[in-house]
Amino acid sequence: MKVWSDRRIIDNKAPLDSFSYPLHYGGPAVWEGMRAYVQEDGSCKIFRLKEHVQRLRDSSKIIGYNIPYSNAEIEQACEALVQQNGNKDLYLRPIAYLNVDAESIHGIQTKDLKLDIYCVPIPKLHRNSEKGIRMVVSNVIRAYPQFTMQAKTPANYADITQVQPLLDQTGVQDAFLLDNQGYVVEATVANFFVVKGDVIMTPPNKGSILPGITRRTVAEVLGDSALMFSKYKKVPRVVEKDITKADLYTADCVFLCGTYAEVVKVSEIDGRAIDGDDSYFRIIQTEYSNVVRGRK
């Protein structure tokens, strides 16, 4: 593991005091997940680096704190980490956090966040198999305005601890979460798409979902009518729509998407098999790989 911390790259985890403010109170902190891919020419490139760094910056603004590095400095630090790790597929996790102790809760004087960036080789994910993963719809609510999901902050993901007992009980790999109206908005750490015929639906960005960079990339590929028609003779219609449980149960195909998991098919939801036409999922798997590997 390589870590960029205080303008230097170290070989171990950055030191974290167990009496730190973020550990006790869930913030202030913001983070990002990025992937670097080996390209066709043998180089290694971070996918959508500028977009990820800007989202990190935006997250810090939303929670009212400052990252004391420019976007260019953060991008350079990420690229230096990739060079240190050699040409292999990598996962990067920048995290900016308030570096004060828990007793400072009523007397914080600084608005500046400390920044560490972790970089590790990424393993092949078993859940990326063609078989797909099993999921349930949980009763856990992740909704605006209780959660400001436009900010990628640890506090917004604390509800994973509420979901985990359900996953352990049912033996499934992930769960969908709801908004205040009972619509399905996200998986625990991923956006999702629902395919029905040539219509591909995804929840609207109304505050209850993270505006995913992978989600946007998938939508761009599916919306490239020239590519879809010339290569696959299929032209889908991608729409943002409030998603119900019935939309999930009657779908031809459902798939998750996110930086770490990439694109993952869902094979079962609440004990109901999702086993219709999965051709759009297979197209996205192929074309997403082409995009991140520099083949497109």
Residue ranges of each PLM-predicted region?
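Short, internal active-site loops enriched in acidic
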Residues: Y97-A102
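Short secondary-structure junctions
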Residues: Q83-L90, L227-F229
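Helix-start/capping segments and mature chain N-termini
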Residues: M1-Y69, E73-A80, E103-K296
